[in-house]
């Protein structure tokens, strides 16, 4: 399990991502996985947590996904494990999933958020 995977680890690189972009599901994913991972890290004596996040996460409160990322970051900051949060720019290889999440038949709802490659 997770305890065995972290045995002897000094650093955890957390690139976890939710399999769903639905507001409640993505929040549940980041809160549950974050708490579970951080508790296991503390028990294993991990000395640093590196988490991948997204530039502008804190400015996109209309998005359930980004609210969940803010919650994930808050859990990391509140933990006893020293951390780095790396906010990278958008990953445009996910654009199809983002568009499909806003599609309903022949209608696509676009986010009002400004993003660029």
Regions found by a protein language model. Name each.
Residues 1-44, 55-61:
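NAD(P)H-binding glycine-rich loop region in Rossmannoid oxidoreductase-like domains
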Residues 20, 42-47, 58-117:
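Oxidoreductase cofactor-interface core, primarily capturing Rossmann-like NAD(P)-dependent enzymes
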